Every structure is written in structure tokens, then in C-alpha cells.
């Protein structure tokens, strides 16, 4: 059984202002806390801009692929996230890493449902950016 197995921790991924700005453009979310360095530094609570929470969530599939290789997959579906809790904000120029532990694996008539306990680590911080149970559906060839 794979339940409870810590699959691994991804390599560190730098979140810079360019990535934050591109995400702001893609999602039409240009709040100053994300995009205005001067205002965020002078008036914001974090002394810098911060990444959008949804930007950090959208990195899960990329970071997961750095940890686990699932072979013979025809299609992988990001099915959802349960019990999501945001912790610390991710400041610009921070490095993040995904820690993944298998919570469950179920075969649903040919589709495999995998739930991982995901924790987004921030380099130099003791608390994560978030934790949650990420659900992937795999359709195999």
C-alpha cells in the first residue's frame, strides 16, 4: 500500500516578479500587493510584493512532476483540492518546494484517483505557504 508514503520533495522553484506579473495579466488580478513593488514595500504588511495564492496553487502539477513519474498516462486531470489552508504568503524572489505524501490511491473502473497531502514549503520559513489534499485522476493507455 502506498498510503502514508512521503513521495518526495521537489527542487526549489524561484517565484520572481516577472512570474507574478504574468500571472496577474493572465488572471486580470493586478492588486498592488502583487504588482506594485514600491507601494507594497512602503505600505504593505510584508515589505515586498507577494505571489497570488492561486499562482502558488497552479504550480502543483509542475512541482508534482518533479517528484513523481507516472508512466503510461493518457491523460492526467487536476480534479480538486480538499482541506486547503493558506499559511504564510510567498514573498517575491522566494523559493518554494512541494512536499508530497500519498494519502490514497483508488482504481475507479480504469481511472486511478490519487490524493496527495501537499505542503508548499518556503525556503527559510518554518511554516508552509499552504497545505491541502490534492486530487489527481489518471487515465492510462
PLM region spans:
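Hot-dog-fold acyl-thioester-processing enzymes
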Residues: 1-78
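HotDog/MaoC-like acyl-thioester-processing domains
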Residues: 1-2, 89-141
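Short, low-complexity, polar/charged sequence segments that are solvent-exposed and flexible
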Residues: 31-34, 42, 78-79, 117-121, ...
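Short alpha-helix capping/helix-loop boundary micro-motifs
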Residues: 81-86
Amino acid at each position: 500500500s502506498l498510503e502514508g508514503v512521503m513521495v518526495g520533495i521537489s527542487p526549489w522553484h524561484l517565484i520572481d516578479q516577472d512570474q507574478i506579473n504574468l500571472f496577474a495579466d493572465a488572471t486580470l488580478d493586478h492588486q498592488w500587493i502583487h504588482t506594485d513593488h514600491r507601494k507594497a514595500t512602503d505600505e504593505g504588511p510584508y515589505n515586498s510584493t507577494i505571489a497570488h495564492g492561486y499562482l502558488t496553487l497552479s504550480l502543483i502539477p509542475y512541482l508534482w512532476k518533479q517528484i513523481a513519474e507516472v508512466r503510461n498516462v493518457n491523460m492526467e486531470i487536476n480534479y480538486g483540492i480538499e482541506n486547503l489552508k493558506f499559511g504564510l504568503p510567498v514573498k517575491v524572489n522566494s523559493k518554494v518546494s512541494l512536499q508530497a505524501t500519498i494519502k490514497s490511491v483508488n482504481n475507479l473502473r480504469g481511472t486511478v484517483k490519487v490524493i496527495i497531502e501537499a505542503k508548499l514549503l518556503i525556503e527559510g520559513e518554518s511554516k508552509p505557504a499552504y497545505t491541502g489534499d490534492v486530487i489527481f485522476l489518471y487515465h492510462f493507455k
